[in-house]
């Protein structure tokens, strides 16, 4: 995993590494800090074992509910929290609620917990954003906000169908049939290449196939 506070488009170390790394799954995040300090420990993605987690958005009123959220993290996981970002706390809440066993359920319970604690403190819309998490084999992505106005999230259409529509596009000949991209905003200007994920939904990309399902936060189970 490579993390840096340097701008990705001007990071020579990243450029050098990218030319020598190959993988069946890449996880990348370029962000502008909102409220948290600009430091490497706050850079996405966050990792626990083989799990990676990143988030585009924010927990509204995080300073007011941070203590409530942090003390809900399982005591065996708590020492791993190194930074001050709301995303890292959300990640460890999801781990506490069973991310390694059932990612959709754990994320639903983590966000449900954030919303419950936020509303108890008078915060109308506690959560905003999109989430991506992976175990290195499969990818889970979520689009949800308390207000129902989430950050955008797009995924690519089937590569084989795109090849038939655009037989002269060299880039489509260079990728495999099972290639998928999930991004915050469309990359490039190829008409029909991108599909926007619906509001309040989650997707799964795995060897068994792709799924797109509704997402609803849940009341969390007891954490201890």
Whereabouts are the PLM-identified features?
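Conserved short alpha-helical segments that host acidic/polar catalytic motifs at enzyme active sites
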Residues: 1-55, 59-224
């Amino acid at each position: 995993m490579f993390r840096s506070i340097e701008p990705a488009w001007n990071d020579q170390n990243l450029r050098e590494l990218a030319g020598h790394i190959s993988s069946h799954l890449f996880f990348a995040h370029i962000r502008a800090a909102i409220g948290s300090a600009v430091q490497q420990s706050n850079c996405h993605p966050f990792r626990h074992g083989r799990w990676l987690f990143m988030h585009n958005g924010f927990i509204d009123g995080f300073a007011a509910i941070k203590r409530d959220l942090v003390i809900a993290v399982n005591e065996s996981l708590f020492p791993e929290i190194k930074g001050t970002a709301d995303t890292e706390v959300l990640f460890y809440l999801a781990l506490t609620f069973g991310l390694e066993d059932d990612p959709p359920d754990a994320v639903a319970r983590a966000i449900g917990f954030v919303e419950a604690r936020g509303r108890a403190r008078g915060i109308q819309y506690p959560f905003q954003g999109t989430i991506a998490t992976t175990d290195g084999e499969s990818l889970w992505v979520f689009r949800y906000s308390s207000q129902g106005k989430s950050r955008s999230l797009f995924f690519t259409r089937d590569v084989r169908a795109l090849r038939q529509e655009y037989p002269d596009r060299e880039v489509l000949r260079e990728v495999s049939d099972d290639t998928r991209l999930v991004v915050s905003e469309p990359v490039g200007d190829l008409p029909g290449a991108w599909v926007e994920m619906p509001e309040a939904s989650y997707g799964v990309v795995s060897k068994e196939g792709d799924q797109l399902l509704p997402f609803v936060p849940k009341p969390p189970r007891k954490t201890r």
